[in-house]
């Protein structure tokens, strides 16, 4: 039995009507384009120019000088999912 802990990391982003954060576990987190003011104002090309930082613990968008973290995304999702119930 494998008892090692797997660290959840961001694998990639997929863009359509929302931003899909694909994790190495196979899970997806969905963010609206108004997640931050800079992301809201960015065009698709600026958002598609991203790189993973911190070994997959965050995302850097150099064209809009924005960094977001997996921890921040999880906090956002938790609070917004609770508000929706």
Predicted regions and their residues:
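Motif-centric detector for short Cys/His coordination patterns
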Residues: 1-85
């Amino acid at each position: 039995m494998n008892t090692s802990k797997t660290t959840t990391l961001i694998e990639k982003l997929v863009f359509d009507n929302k931003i899909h954060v694909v994790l190495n576990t196979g899970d997806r987190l969905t963010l609206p384009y108004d997640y931050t003011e800079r992301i809201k104002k960015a065009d698709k090309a600026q958002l598609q120019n991203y790189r993973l930082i911190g070994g997959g613990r965050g995302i850097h968008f150099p064209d809009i000088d924005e960094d977001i973290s997996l921890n921040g995304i999880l906090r956002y999702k938790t609070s917004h999912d609770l508000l929706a119930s």
